[in-house]
């Protein structure tokens, strides 16, 4: 095992043992990875279609549609549940306080069941898919702006929590227009894009490559740092497998895909051997992704996964929201504790949005 905060050169040397997880580079692969988020242009037929690498083949749905729907609803509602539980400990040092229920409070003095920016951004993303029938980044950004300025899609009518990188992205979008794509520097690799990932994975459940492309693009709406985009793509893969009925062991097994070194090491599964004091829960996207995978791997039900994640403290709401997406897709909406569902603000609306995304999912088209 290695600490993912080691310098990149050291990590790259260490990661040579996992070189089999990186796909062989080719012109066809480069063409597939080069797309404009404002004008998606993936291959749809002919020779380009036949060149799709095996690792991008969509896994078959192994379960009845009703069970897959339950998992899709679990992913989005689970996100909001984790957010609402984790906010109590947001910004607190680890083990200063603990939670064992949805109690509200925290730095924003929320009521039990109210949630933060994690869920607000996910709802903006879900609504943009439903309105456009695809990922329209400009529409998504406009919905984010309305949340930021007017409190739309918030739990209490106010935008009371927004990350610095997200705020900067929206201000730059308002200043420069739809062609602006920034926040590319490594230090901007926060977790705001992975915490809203679930709608993309639900809508694109029938196409792994569309999941891969849309995950990248939805991140670019605010976060263009490579680790942010790759973390969304990796989480998109995990959710795709789980919504389609794969076991935890299958979904969490190493996948072949092009990833920067820190995400590659998470993909390799080194977190499975780490102890709690080796897991960080900061707002850095790598810390959040690793902590969420670790929490789901080390529990066997939704309830325990969320509490294990939230009680890591620090960026507790985002770690628990990311955990909630994974655990919700694994165990399903029907296995989320009913008392938590009853407390969750706008629970029925969130569940209905997930169902709309599920039934709108386009067929594989290339």
From Swiss-Prot:
The keyword Hydrolase applies. Its EC number is 3.2.2.19. InterPro entries: ADP-ribosylglycohydrolase, Ribosyl_crysJ1, Ribosyl_crysJ1_sf, Tri1-like. Changing residue 32 to E: Partially protects E.coli against cognate toxin Tre1. No longer protects E.coli. SUPFAM superfamilies: ADP-ribosylglycohydrolase. Keywords: Hydrolase, Magnesium, Metal-binding. Changing residue 161 to N: Partially protects E.coli against cognate toxin Tre1, no longer de-ADP-ribosylates FtsZ. No longer protects E.coli. Mg(2+) binds at residues 116-118, 161, 317. Residues 74-366 are annotated as: ADP-ribosyl hydrolase domain. It catalyses: N(omega)-(ADP-D-ribosyl)-L-arginyl-[protein] + H2O = ADP-D-ribose + L-arginyl-[protein]. GO terms for molecular function: ADP-ribosylarginine hydrolase activity; metal ion binding. It is an enzyme of class 3 (hydrolase). The keyword Protein biosynthesis does not apply. Disruption phenotype: A double tre1-tri1 deletion is outcompeted by wild-type cells, but not by wild-type cells missing a type 6 secretion system (T6SS). Residues 1-65 are annotated as: N-terminal extension. It comes from the Bacteria. Binds 1 Mg(2+) ion per subunit. Immunity component of a contact-dependent interbacterial competition system (also called effector-immunity systems). Acts as an arginine mono-ADP-ribosylhydrolase, mediating the removal of mono-ADP-ribose attached to arginine residues on proteins. De-ADP-ribosylates FtsZ, is able to act on other proteins as well. Neutralizes the toxic activity of cognate toxin Tre1-Sp. Expression of this protein alone in E.coli partially protects the cells against competition by wild-type S.proteamaculans. The N-terminal extension forms a projection that reaches into the active site of cognate toxin Tre1-Sp where it occludes the active site. Forms a stable complex with cognate effector protein Tre1-Sp. Belongs to the ADP-ribosylglycohydrolase family. This is ADP-ribosylarginine hydrolase Tri1. It comes from Serratia proteamaculans (strain 568).
